[in-house]
Amino acid sequence: MATTQNYGTGRRKTASARVFLRPGKGDIVVNGKPLDAYFGRETSRMVVRQPLEVAQAGNRFDVFATTAGGGANGQAGAIRLGIARALVEYDETLRGSMRAAGFMTRDAREVERKKVGLRKARRATQFSKR
């Protein structure tokens, strides 16, 4: 018996997530742990749930996500994008509401590299006129 599932990939900063959406009762599992156990901060958990709330599908799907790289916020953003893409794969009519909420756009901001001669990416040493 083959179970139907939808797949979405998400990336944010240096984090990447593979998200599988299956019909269920609303369980969210990240790297084998429940959502509340994996993310300590409530804001990260809220970010992950946002696409399901917009689609009003909070308790219709089980979400299985594997993430790698980055920190907690980057991984949460990557999972959010993956869930949104999987929901659109499941129901194409959700694309408009997902785009309006900003969940279909990959956040392209990356860390700027440190330059030689500067203390950080843009921070120079203090300038002394005399």
Swiss-Prot record:
The keyword Nuclease does not apply. One of its GO terms (cellular component) is cytosolic small ribosomal subunit. InterPro entries: Ribosomal_Su5_D2-typ_SF, Ribosomal_uS9, Ribosomal_uS9_bac/plastid, Ribosomal_uS9_CS, Ribsml_uS5_D2-typ_fold_subgr. Keywords: Ribonucleoprotein, Ribosomal protein. The keyword Ribonucleoprotein applies. Transmembrane segments: none annotated. The gene is rpsI. One of its GO terms (biological process) is translation. GO terms for molecular function: RNA binding; structural constituent of ribosome. It holds the Pfam family Ribosomal_S9. This is Small ribosomal subunit protein uS9. Belongs to the universal ribosomal protein uS9 family.
